[in-house]
């Protein structure tokens, strides 16, 4: 057994303009090739576009979108006796938010449009309204978990 001390849990930092942890999580997921300033530009442009489209607080739209896409349950492949079962498992809040952000960014990357800021803002507004690809992905995951409910005891 290791004699080292346990590592302290890191708290999520918040972004410089909005002082919001969700925005920072979004920036870190959109980041490519270490270009963080570009990631910040994309996010802030998307937030401005949301402000123009909805004429409400863009951070509340972001929170609502992430809350709408966050899954409560997911399936995990588990090998039992030579066959692989999709076992439904509950998801914690942090992991759920991370999944929601990943799905939102994936859906916005697939969208047709001019640039990433435009696509991301459109996806966030749609998700806040309860439509869009990311919401569909969440519903699909929940259906999969419900269909494989019989394997819940394999946890």
From Swiss-Prot:
Belongs to the universal ribosomal protein uS7 family. The gene is rps7. InterPro entries: Ribosomal_uS7, Ribosomal_uS7_bac/org-type, Ribosomal_uS7_CS, Ribosomal_uS7_dom, Ribosomal_uS7_dom_sf. One of its GO terms (cellular component) is chloroplast. GO terms for biological process: translation. This is Small ribosomal subunit protein uS7c. Part of the 30S ribosomal subunit. Keywords: Chloroplast, Plastid, Ribonucleoprotein, Ribosomal protein, RNA-binding, rRNA-binding. One of the primary rRNA binding proteins, it binds directly to 16S rRNA where it nucleates assembly of the head domain of the 30S subunit. CDD domains: uS7_Chloroplast (cd14871).
